[in-house]
Amino acid sequence: SGLHVRIMNDTPDPRRNLPSIDSLIQILDAKYPLPEFSHDQKVDAARRVLDEIRARASGPPLPGREEILERLRAELESLGNLGLRRVVNGTGIVLHTNLGRAVLPPEAMAAVAELEGYCSLQIDLESGRRGRRDSGVEDLLRRITGAEAATVVNNNAAATLLVLAALCAGRDVIVSRGQLIEIGGSFRLPDVIAQSGARLVEVGTTNKTHPRDYENAITDNTRVLLRVNPSNYRITGFTRQVSTAELAEIKQGRDLILVDDLGCGALVDLAAYGLPSEPTVQGSLRAGADVALFSGDKLIGGPQSGIIVGRRKYIDLIRRHPLARALRVGKFAMTALEATLKLFLNPETFRETGRLNVHS
């Protein structure tokens, strides 16, 4: 047994034959000059490659010098690749969540490109005083939707959170059970409502909710009637949901706020273009919604954003809430959204703007 131990101890560790970091970089510089990477970056990459090889030494035979060199070059080149890459959407799903949702129109990309230097993000150019970054977008949304006021946050889930936090914290929000949706990434509407500080009151059943269900649930603590458009699924057959107009009738004479979460949202009637119909923002407001919220990066075709429109007194409360600053959008998204919304100002040339065309 003593001989056996001596033989095992005398067996050389193959990892000792691995090249040093310095020698590896010298060979790399001579064979594959990569001037775009600093010496420190090359050292870090070489260390990662060698550490990975050492960690797997008990498996397959160790790679030779040339293979190690190729791994190092690949490691460095991967540093130069952006995390987001251009792809061709061959899925058949136009608004694909994992592929970036809507394709931005050329007008939006051109507008963003102009922001190479400083810009009038939050300044009144006439007075030189601080302004509101959403003033331009608000003006466009007022003209397009007929709303009294509007503001923008970074996505529609954020819009839901902000609206309920500003208008319903500590109070009850009534929602149909058939509209308690789950969106991408396992984020559920009841969880968003809980984070807002509002108290969820469920009414009706999964497939059927009647006006009387809302009326019977209203108490002195009720503040919001919330309608949610289930954009990512449909319940068909033996069903009944309460419309925005019916909810508006229910809240008549009561100190309640009707909030309509349209999800994808539409600023034009898609049926006129041979597409499946979706509730429009204008229709929601005409039906009596006090506040409507929807995504800017789906049917509208703009950047990721959550758009909130409605009565001015409620939009002002929403805009002044502390969460509004935490959820606000940056200059690039704001500019791209503004350029996209301008395409909706002329319905007669809407098809020519390309917003209903599919781009690869």
Provide a role label for each language-model segment.
Residues 125-344:
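Conserved PLP-enzyme active-site core in the AAT-like
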Residues 46-47, 51, 90-91, 101-126:
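Glycine-rich phosphate-binding segment of PLP-dependent enzymes
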